[in-house]
Swiss-Prot record:
Residues 529-545, 553-571 have a biased composition (Polar residues). It comes from the Eukaryota. Pathway: Protein modification; protein ubiquitination. The modification Phosphoserine is found at residues 548, 806, 981, 1115. This is Roquin-2. The record marks 509 as: Cleavage. Disruption phenotype: Mutant animals are born at Mendelian ratio, but very few reach adulthood, a large proportion die within the first days after birth. Lethality can be rescued by changing the genetic background from C57BL/6 to outbred NMRI, on which mutant animals appear healthy and fertile, although smaller. Immune cell homeostasis is normal. However, Mice lacking both Rc3h1 and Rc3h2 genes in CD4(+) T-cells develop lymphadenopathy and splenomegaly with increased spleen weight and cellularity, already at young age. Pfam families: ROQ_II, Roquin_1_2-like_ROQ, zf-CCCH, zf-RING_5. One of its GO terms (cellular component) is cell surface. Highest levels in lymph node and thymus and slightly lesser amounts in brain, lung, and spleen (at protein level). Very weak expression in heart, muscle, and kidney (at protein level). Expressed in CD4(+) helper T-cells (at protein level).
Length: 1187
């Protein structure tokens, strides 16, 4: 059995006895086959043959000279004259010169021969391939003929490698890989990367290793199908190029077929992965050589395998591919390179020596060289190697460049094992392990510094940014982008907000802390720059005695939580005064998986603001104290979808109403019907939760768009949400995939992202919450309430009443509708407000309001109170959206912002703007021009009353969930714009009145709700008939129908969606009649300030006469709605009640059909006091004027 040969790096020890060579006992003696053993082991051989390859030893063992080239590396002294005698003196002379050259070259191996465990200070200047070839040369026995042949071949190989090294020194490594893959692609082949290429080759082997013959198409499809789960980017084209690479390498045996594709069978010698991979690699190396590229084995290993462990493998491939002509070609290439660079190191002097080495025959059976040829070859190789070392040390731009470690890399952070165990490292300077303790500590320290300097959040610790920090009770400071203290609020138990502390309790919302923080700072900075529009002082909001929900939850890094109403009070969200931040900062880095916290406005805030330490991380979620109901996130966003993934810009909206019959649709819609919903239903969400923005099964998430003048907050206004019992099961599950952030109710589920269906109650059990809902409507639109009037930002809203939250409605304001906290204007074509109380088929949600284009205000939910008596009068909901003229519309259809159409702001994702149970098609094509739409345009789509209006909860398509909540009052406000400047007076009066009437309001609300339900079904028919009679009498007396022909016929009807919540005592009924008299009488005077005429596109409508035989009541009660002419039949329900025995129930009454016109609903507001000159009127721009 031949002995296993040692590794080439262990050339300083005997491969048989493993003893290190020395000059006494274990003298190194090289054999003709280039194996070197110690003299002791050589004398013990039984036969004169090499123990490794069984080559015969022709010369006497005692005559073979000692290899002093190796002895000098272990510290032995080389004698000047060696006692060796050849046939003649000339041979001895040539031998001495050649031996001296080899011994000189061996000195370059000195770093590999340091003492055991001791690192050598002088690192080798030669690369690892050069060192390996030099070891081969040093081990040659020049005395024997076989040894001289091997020495000549080793000299040639060393010279060829020298040329390659010199070319590599002049080559740009950045362009190397690009040039290589360009050459590979030019031949119809492709390399897919180390991991993917390896997997593809293994799959090809799996398909063909049994000798089966497949067509190229079938083979490619098989590989692609198996690759797709791990590599989704795999395609038939790319895999076909990989197969073509193997085809070029002659790995297949091809069988041609007539009029059919050829069959490919893997050759037997390539039916193992190692053989197939070697041939594959050899083909790529061959392509590189054809392209004239010089690539080192290290680079090959890195390119093809992604590591440095395959250098020897690649070197052997390179060596095998070398042809006798390749050396000469390399010399020519080097000459051209030197001409281009100017040759500062005078490398042209090496050209004769290189040409001499190139002329050596590399064949193993070549003729034995003469002694003179041996001497010349050794001198030539010594010269060129010296020239290479000199160039690397003195002229190379890459010479001894220290590799730059990446953060957290393992580069030189542990000691070299070869150095410890063998006493020397063959890798030299290229070793990725440390060779000394100083080097080890140096790189470990550098690694720590690089890790510490990685910035996770670029805006921390700058002016105006307050980071989050944990306090003792789990409270977290909000990220506020203001340069000054914006205001300090303390929530007290009596509902008063003081300015003492600015710490707010935060709750987690989704993930991506750094992304969310940067986004929040950006939005708050934008809000801060617009804060001057809100009033003289941004801190004026904190003067409110009534806690109001934040105007814009996410913009102030504070999202209201739908928590228990008895847990603390609501807090004011203060708009920052100013902000120094630019809003053009990129908002969305690619990934981060932390948690961002947002304010919970219902929690006590007793702590001062500490500063945030400079770390890049956020504290854990705040702990919930014992005995307190925990608040779940109000706005939940899934984190398993990449933020930057966008749907196609032209992606059609999903149709959530595909199950309805065609008669329920607006069949004359100018838009194409959307395709069917492509995602299945999502499991039901918890009670009060909005349908999610996207399904977590989708592969993209709707992105937030950035504009110059408006920051889209992608959040909903803080509002109370609808109980799950209102929805029927099928409808609820159908709408769970609608777009928009969804709210989570007070009940904390196990996981904020998991949907927990709650028990559904029958509709008849909702009666205790109807009055509460009507009382809390103002709270839900506070975010869109204050825009231009300085005092309007401080308008009060009704505080939370002790009754439970109302489950009566849910409004989905899409993320397209966003406003800043104070003063940010709409800068896009303004969308219509979708009202939850609308009738599904009429679409009072489709209103488009024509008003002053730039005077944009959205006031809502003003609590109107009597200045004298303190009794609560009414709440008038003024929903208004402004529409710019078409020439002022800056919207580009395919810009990065949302598309604005007559249906509102249309985002780039599949969304439905509002929750309704009727099939209203509210989609728009991108880029469609914004066109005003009047309600009368849609009158033909209102069908006659059918079975859908017959009962409250039997039909799944019934809109009674919404239409029974309130009446809609529509007023022609064409002449009101000129009086909009007087709205400030009323706002001031409202602010002064709120403190006197707060307690009375709560008491009246509580009393009204107790008495309301006693008259569940009484008098609803009588009230409606009485209402019609009273209206006709008022209209006949005042003749105000003749005063309203001043509007243009083509003018849009401006719709004011208003709901009157009437909770007044019995003594107010006579005053209400007086109020109507005042309003109807003055309407024809003050410049038509309140035109009571029913108008359809600017023309007065004919009045509809009711049957005079119906019973009549003595007062209007609280139904202040004028129901007038209607061409089609429109269902209207009586929704207002009064705490009297004959009042009307709002939650349990059946729908009542009457003849009204959708365009002719007139809003009659009531007087604030007994004075006839002091009453409120809705104005076109959303302000309220005190006449």
């Amino acid at each position: 059995m031949p002995v296993q040969a040692a590794q080439w790096t262990e050339f300083l020890s005997c491969p048989i006895c493993y003893n290190e060579f020395d000059e006494n006992v274990h003298k190194p003696i090289s054999l003709g086959c280039s194996h070197t053993v110690c003299k002791t082991c050589l004398n013990k051989l039984h036969r004169k043959a090499c123990p490794f390859d069984q080559t015969a030893i022709n010369t006497d063992i005692d005559v073979l000279p000692v290899n002093f080239a190796l002895l000098q590396l272990v510290g032995a002294q080389v004698p000047d004259h060696q006692s060796i005698k050849l046939s003649n003196l000339g041979e001895n002379k040539h031998y001495e010169v050649a031996k001296k050259c080899v011994e000189d070259l061996a000195l370059y191996l000195k770093p590999l021969s340091g003492g055991k465990g001791v690192a050598s200070l002088n690192q080798s200047a030669l690369s690892r391939p050069m060192q390996r070839k030099l070891v081969t040369l040093v081990n040659c026995q020049l005395v024997e003929e076989e040894g001289r042949v091997r020495a000549m071949r080793a000299a040639r190989s060393l010279g060829e490698r020298t040329v390659t090294e010199l070319i590599l020194q002049h080559q740009n490594p950045q362009q190397l890989s690009a040039n290589l893959w360009a050459a590979v692609r030019a031949r119809g082949c492709q390399f897919l990367g180390p991991a993917m290429q390896e997997e593809a080759l293994k799959l090809v082997l799996l398909a063909l290793e049994d000798g089966s013959a497949l067509s190229r198409k079938v083979l490619v499809l098989f590989v692609v199908q198996r690759l797709e789960p791990r590599f989704p980017q795999a395609s038939k084209t790319s895999i076909g190029h990989v197969v073509q690479l193997l085809y070029r390498a002659s790995c297949f045996k091809v069988t041609k077929r007539d009029e059919d594709s050829s069959l490919m069978q893997l050759k037997e010698e390539f039916r193992s992965y190692e053989a197939l991979r070697r041939e594959h690699d050899a083909q790529i190396v061959h392509i590189a050589m054809e392209a004239g590229l010089r690539i080192s084995p290290e680079q090959w290993s890195s390119l093809l395998y992604g590591d440095l462990a395959h250098k020897s493998h690649m070197q052997s491939i390179i060596d095998k591919l070398q042809s006798p002509e390749s050396f000469a070609k390399s010399v020519q290439e080097l000459t051209i390179v030197l001409q281009r660079t100017g040759d500062p190191a005078n490398l042209n002097r090496l050209r004769p020596h290189l040409e001499l080495l190139a002329n050596i025959d590399p064949n193993p059976d070549a003729v034995s060289p003469t002694w003179e040829q041996l001497e010349n070859a050794m001198v030539a190789v010594k010269t060129v190697v010296h020239g290479l070392v000199d160039f690397i040390q003195n002229y190379s731009r890459k010479g001894h460049e220290t590799p730059q470690p990446q953060p957290n890399s393992k580069y030189k952070t542990s000691m070299c094992r070869d150095l410890r165990q063998q006493g020397g490292c063959p890798r030299g300077t290229n070793c990725t392990f440390a060779h000394s303790q100083e080097e080890l500590e140096k790189y470990r320290l550098r690694n720590k510094k690089m890790s510490a300097t990685v910035r996770t959040f670029p805006l921390l610790n700058k002016v105006g940014v307050n980071s989050t920090v944990t306090t003792t009770a789990g409270n977290v400071i909000s990220v506020i982008g203001s340069t000054e203290t914006t205001g300090k609020i303390v929530a007290s138990t009596n509902g008063i907000s003081n300015t003492e502390s600015s710490v707010s309790q935060l709750i987690p919302r989704g993930t991506d802390s750094a992304v969310r923080t940067l986004e929040t700072v950006k939005k708050v900075g934008k809000v801060g720059t617009n804060a001057q529009n809100a009033g003289p002082s941004a801190e004026s909001v904190s003067e409110n005695k009534i806690g109001s929900p934040p105007k814009t939850p996410v913009s102030n890094a504070a999202a209201t939580s739908a928590g228990p109403s008895n847990f603390g009070t609501e807090l004011n969200s203060l708009p920052p005064k100013s902000s120094p931040f630019l809003t053009r900062v990129p908002v969305y880095p690619q990934h981060s998986e932390s948690i961002q916290y947002f304010q919970d406005p219902r929690t006590q805030i007793p702590f001062e603001v500490p500063q945030y330490p400079q770390t890049g991380y956020y504290p854990p979620p705040p702990t919930v104290p014992a005995g307190v109901t925990p608040c779940v996130p109000r706005f939940v966003r899934s984190s398993n979808v990449p933020e930057s993934s966008l749907p196609p810009a032209s992606m059609p909206y999903a149709d959530h109403y595909s199950t309805f019959s065609p008669r329920d649709r607006m069949n004359s819609s100018p838009y194409q019907p959307p395709p069917p919903q492509q995602y299945g239903p999502v499991p039901p969400v918890p009670s009060g939760m909005y349908a999610p923005v996207y399904d977590s099964r989708r592969i993209w998430r709707p992105a937030m768009y950035q504009r110059d003048d408006i920051i889209r907050s992608n959040s909903l206004p803080p509002m109370d949400v609808m109980h799950s019992s209102v929805y029927q099961t099928s409808l609820r599950e159908r709408y769970n995939s609608l777009d928009g952030y969804y709210s989570v109710a007070c009940q904390p589920p196990n996981d904020p992202r998991t949907t927990v269906p709650l028990p559904r109650e029958p509709c008849g059990h909702l009666k205790t919450s109807c009055e509460e809902q009507l009382r809390r409507k103002p709270d839900q639109w506070t975010q869109y309430h204050t825009q231009k009037t300085p005092v309007s930002s401080t308008l009060p809203v009704a505080t939370q009443s002790p009754t439970p939250p109302s489950p009566l409605f849910s409004v989905d304001f899409r993320s397209d509708f966003s406003e800043s906290v104070s003063g940010a204007k709409f800068e896009e074509d303004h969308l219509s407000h979708y009202s939850p109380w609308s009738c599904g088929t009429i679409g009072s949600c489709i209103n488009a309001i024509d008003s002053e284009p730039k005077d944009v205000i959205a006031n809502s939910n003003a609590v109107l109170m009597d200045l004298d008596s303190g009794d609560v009068k009414r709440r008038v909901h003024l929903f208004e959206a402004q529409r710019r003229t078409k020439e002022e519309d800056p919207i580009i259809p395919f810009s990065d912002g949302p598309i604005i159409s007559k249906w509102g702001a249309i985002s780039r994702s599949s969304r439905t703007g509002y929750h309704t149970t009727d099939p209203v098609q509210a989609t728009a094509s991108q880029g469609s021009a914004t066109k005003p739409i009047s309600v009368s345009d849609y009158v033909p789509y209102v069908n006659a009353v059918d079975s859908r209006w017959s009962s409250y909860g039997n039909d799944a398509t019934s809109s009674a969930h919404y239409i029974e909540r309130d009446r809609f009052i529509v007023t022609d406000l064409s002449g009101h714009r000129k009086h909009s400047s007087t709205g400030d007076l009323l706002s001031i009066e409202l602010q002064q009145a709120k403190s006197n009437s707060l307690l009375l309001q709560r008491e009246a609300n509580a009393l009204a709700m107790q008495q309301k339900w006693n008259s569940l079904d009484e008098g609803r028919h009588l009230t409606l008939n009485l209402l019609s009679k009273e209206i006709e009498l008022r209209n006949g007396e005042n003749d105000y129908t003749e005063d309203t022909v001043d509007t243009k016929p083509d003018r849009d009807i401006e719709l004011e969606l208003s709901a009157l919540d009437t909770d007044e005592p019995d003594g107010q009924s006579e005053q209400i009649e007086e109020i109507l008299d005042i309003q109807l009488g003055i309407s024809s005077q003050n410049d038509q300030l309140l035109n009571g005429t029913a108008v359809e596109n600017g023309h007065p409508a004919q009045q509809h006469q009711k049957d005079p035989g119906k019973p009549k009541r003595q007062s209007l009660g609280e139904d202040h709605v004028i129901l007038e002419e209607q061409k089609p039949i429109l269902p209207v329900t009586s929704c207002f009640s009064q705490p009297r025995p004959m009042s009307i129930s709002s939650a349990s009454c059946l729908p009542i059909t009457t003849s009204v016109s959708v365009g002719n609903l007139i809003l009659k507001t009531h007087v604030m006091s007994e004075d006839k000159n002091d009453f409120l009127k809705p104005i076109a721009n959303g302000k309220m004027v005190n006449s």
